[in-house]
Amino acid sequence: METILVCDDDREIVEAIDIYLSQEGYKVLKAYDGIEALEVLKNNEVHLLVIDVMMPRLDGLRATLKIRQESSIPIIILSAKSEDADKILGLNVGADDYVTKPFNPLELTARVKSQLRRYTKLGNKTAVNDSIYQAGGLVINDELKEVTVDGEHVKLTPIEYNILLLLVKNQGKVFSINQIYESIWNEEAIGADITVAVHIRHIREKIEGNPNDPRYLKVVWGVGYMIEKQ
């Protein structure tokens, strides 16, 4: 049974999410501020975090920053703010997805399932045979779910890994933002520009020696992104 931590200072929201996720067969742990969330994560195996932004003591953004120093579990941020700047900030600190309040519980449940599928796949470390994809010094072992650049291990979130794998598998092919979003999120790309752009920037920061002059992940202006054939 997969365990989900729900963190929000509004106890009614926590209870409502608990009901929906429990009905789907998930074990739900609860916290009511960022400090409590960190403590729960420290003492339990958690597979996904749903966390609110505005909370006392330690808010969701600062908590996410701290969590990302230790863990790559999927993080879905909840916020009453719907402005693009707030979404960018949430993704910048390491969140994988962003849901605006008020939200449809069925939509949140669907996003939880989607994120967990990626995380479960990324966490599968049993190798039966090699499935290696390489672009110069960039190597992806898709059986072990490992990425190295010039022999150095690179730690990616599940979303980042799947975007990079898509591009490396199709070296030389340009993918539009909508194509990337629909391939990875498996849903219609509506307002996907910011989400994809932030994840692309994070990938570059991790795989490129100089993200401003990328060696691997190139932008084709007005079209999309690609991994150049090496």
Model-predicted regions and their roles:
Residues 44-51:
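Active-site beta3 strand of CheY-like receiver
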Residues 25-32, 40:
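Short hydrophobic/Thr-rich beta-strand motif most characteristic of the beta2 strand and flanking loop
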Residues 130, 155, 200, 204-230:
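DNA-binding patch around the recognition helix
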Residues 3, 114-174, 178:
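Short, Lys/Arg-enriched segments at the junction into DNA-binding effector domains
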Residues 32-36, 59-62, 86:
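Acidic catalytic/metal-coordinating carboxylates
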Residues 12-23:
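Charged docking surfaces used in two-component/phosphorelay signaling
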Residues 53-55:
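Receiver (REC) domain active-site loop signature in two-component systems and cognate sites
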Residues 65, 69, 73-134:
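Basic, amphipathic DNA-recognition helix from helix-turn-helix-like DNA-binding domains
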